[in-house]
């Protein structure tokens, strides 16, 4: 009996066997990503794909400063409003910045024909040559070119007029018919602007042009229009009851434009030979110009980012990330981050059987932890880690390269009468934006799911690699660990890690230890059976003695009568 109890104690005592475990890296990262199946999954490493910051400034693009119109509008700048005189010398720019409430536009009130289309044309222009299309002194010898000024276009307290137009008036009591032409020899498109004056009454018409009925004719290969002044009293705007309507056309190289009139012509003085440049544009912004360089400019500020997406502003100029409405686009590159032994939630542990990551393993994503008589330690599996890093890096770079189409996205111009078209355009743009946002988010969700599954598979493969080497020389004890049936020193452990484990070398020792352990189990079972029998017999005797004592007590006090019949 003593021998059996000794065997039992030996079986119950813990064995100090050598072990090796397969595990994965964990750290103190708080990065979270979303997948198709889960939200806010904490991971060890991730990359952000969404730029959400800007510097709040207007910066140079490719070393070229923008054209800041200040208090002037596009109309004020291109017509030459006297209050915009500082802009006359500007010849090149990376983009044009206009404030939302620019004060100086058309100083003399009137209608600017096809203004939105002109803005659209200028948005693709990066420089121009301003030149005299009809020199002031020599082109109009029979007309007055100095008295055409107005208080509405005053400059430094004096009446003035646009710097790029001439208001031709009567000279010496007459306004002879005029005919003037220009041939475009610039080898570029030339922007030509002019106007037609509409007086408020017939007296002004006669005073300025010496005739009641007048006309203005403008003709080129692609433009042909005849204007008749509309004389009528109108509400005062900028203290003017008259109006000037403004017109423009683009003259192709080699084309000719002809002006004919017998009154009311606001003649071209300066024209512009346009140079178009990819990436230019017009933005409306209150931001100030700063001494900074950027690759991408938005109305909010400049963006310096190589990320494929941004949520700063849909209007961009330069090499810009694609705008999406997302608030988070983060792609996982590492593993699920579970630093301690805890559940991974609905989907269990990583690789299906390992409950927690190792913060002690810092030199790789997957690896080993061993324990033997010589000590314990962590070691990364460099080959599987490097293969995973290469694969994921290539995938992330591929995603960024495919989605990182840098481009300019400027707003489209519509006038007040085209409100329905503008609303329709917004709906179309919103639809495209929703599609882009959905595609970006779905791409990230799918790739995150694939990456985490990829890591799970790598851990599982590493486990199976060890299992296939050890075979029955060790037993699986759960949580990714194996317990050796033989002594495994550091050299032995290293052979398991590098795939050179010598199974036959340790198989005999393992077999003997397995048989000993199996024998201990059988002896333990015999002891447990003996103890069970003794326990049953002892319990029965105690029960019988108790019943006898109770019966004797009851018979002695008369509570129980006992009769024996023969």
Curated annotation (Swiss-Prot):
It is found in: Virion membrane; Host apical cell membrane. Keywords: Clathrin- and caveolin-independent endocytosis of virus by host, Clathrin-mediated endocytosis of virus by host, Disulfide bond, Fusion of virus membrane with host endosomal membrane, Fusion of virus membrane with host membrane, Glycoprotein, Hemagglutinin, Host cell membrane, Host membrane, Host-virus interaction, Lipoprotein, Membrane, Palmitate, Signal, Transmembrane, Transmembrane helix, Viral attachment to host cell, Viral envelope protein, Viral penetration into host cytoplasm, Virion, Virus endocytosis by host, Virus entry into host cell. InterPro entries: Capsid_hemagglutn (IPR008980), Hemagglutn_HA1_a/b_dom_sf (IPR013828), Hemagglutn_influenz_A (IPR000149), Hemagglutn_influenz_A/B (IPR001364). One of its GO terms (cellular component) is host cell plasma membrane. Residues 1-17 form the signal peptide. Its main location: virion. GO terms for molecular function: host cell surface receptor binding. The keyword Membrane applies. It is a single-pass type I membrane protein. The record marks 344-345 as: Cleavage. The chain crosses the membrane at residues 530-550. The keyword Membrane applies. It comes from the Viruses. Major glycoprotein, comprises over 80% of the envelope proteins present in virus particle. The extent of infection into host organism is determined by HA. Influenza viruses bud from the apical surface of polarized epithelial cells (e.g. bronchial epithelial cells) into lumen of lungs and are therefore usually pneumotropic. The reason is that HA is cleaved by tryptase clara which is restricted to lungs. However, HAs of H5 and H7 pantropic avian viruses subtypes can be cleaved by furin and subtilisin-type enzymes, allowing the virus to grow in other organs than lungs. This is Hemagglutinin. It comes from Influenza A virus (strain A/India/6263/1980 H1N1). The gene is HA.
């Amino acid at each position: 009996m003593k021998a059996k109890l000794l065997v039992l104690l030996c079986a119950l005592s813990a064995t100090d066997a050598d072990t090796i475990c397969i595990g994965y890296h964990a750290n103190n990262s708080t990065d979270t990503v979303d997948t198709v199946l889960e939200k806010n999954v904490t991971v060890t490493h991730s990359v952000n794909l969404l730029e959400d910051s800007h510097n709040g400034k207007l910066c140079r693009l490719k070393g070229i400063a923008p054209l800041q119109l200040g208090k002037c509008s596009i109309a004020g700048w291109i017509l030459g409003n006297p209050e915009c005189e500082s802009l006359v010398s500007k010849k090149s720019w990376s983009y044009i910045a206009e404030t939302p409430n620019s004060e100086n536009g058309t100083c003399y009130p009137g209608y600017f024909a096809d203004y939105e289309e002109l803005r659209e044309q200028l948005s693709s222009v990066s420089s121009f040559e301003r030149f005299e299309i009809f020199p002031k002194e020599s082109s109009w010898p029979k007309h007055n070119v100095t008295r055409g000024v107005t208080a509405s276009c005053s400059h430094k307290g004096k009446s003035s007029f646009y710097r790029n137009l001439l208001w031709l008036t009567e000279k010496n009591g007459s306004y002879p018919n005029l005919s003037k032409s220009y041939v475009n020899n610039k080898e570029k498109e030339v922007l030509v602007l002019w106007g037609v004056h509409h007086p408020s009454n017939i007296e002004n018409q006669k005073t300025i042009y010496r005739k009641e009925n007048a006309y203005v004719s403008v003709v080129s290969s692609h433009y042909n229009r005849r204007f008749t002044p509309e004389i009528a009293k109108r509400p005062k705007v900028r203290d003017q009851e008259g109006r000037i309507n403004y017109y423009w056309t683009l003259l192709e190289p080699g084309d000719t434009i002809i002006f004919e009139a017998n009154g009311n012509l606001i003649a071209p003085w300066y024209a512009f030979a346009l140079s178009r440049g990819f990436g230019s544009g017009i933005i409306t912004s209150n931001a100030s110009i700063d001494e900074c360089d950027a690759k991408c400019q938005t109305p909010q500020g400049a963006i310096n980012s190589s990320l494929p997406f941004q949520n700063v502003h849909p209007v961009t100029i330069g090499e810009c990330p694609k705008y999406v409405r997302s608030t988070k686009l983060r792609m996982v590159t590492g593993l699920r981050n579970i630093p301690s032994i805890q559940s991974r939630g609905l989907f269990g542990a990583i690789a299906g059987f390992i409950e927690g990551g190792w913060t002690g393993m810092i030199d790789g994503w997957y690896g080993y932890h061993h324990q033997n008589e010589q000590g314990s330690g962590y070691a990364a599996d460099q080959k599987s880690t490097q293969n995973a890093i290469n694969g994921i890096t290539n995938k992330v770079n591929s995603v960024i390269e495919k989605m990182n189409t840098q481009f300019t996205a400027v707003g489209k111009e519509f006038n007040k009468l085209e409100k329905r078209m503008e609303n329709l355009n917004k709906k179309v743009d919103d639809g495209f934006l929703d599609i882009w946002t959905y595609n970006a988010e779905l791409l990230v969700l799918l790739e995150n799911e694939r990456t985490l599954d990829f890591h799970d598979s790598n851990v599982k493969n590493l486990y199976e690699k060890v299992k296939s080497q050890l075979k029955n020389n060790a037993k699986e004890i759960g949580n990714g660990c194996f317990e050796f049936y033989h002594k495994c020193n550091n050299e032995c452990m290293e052979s398991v890690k590098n795939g050179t484990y010598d199974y036959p070398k340790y198989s005999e020792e393992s077999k003997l230890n397995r048989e000993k352990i199996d024998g201990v189990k059988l002896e333990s079972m015999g002891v447990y059976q003996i103890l069970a029998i003794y326990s049953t017999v002892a319990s029965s005797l105690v029960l019988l003695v108790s019943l006898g004592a109770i019966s004797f007590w009851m018979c002695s006090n008369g509570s129980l009568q006992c009769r024996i019949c023969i």
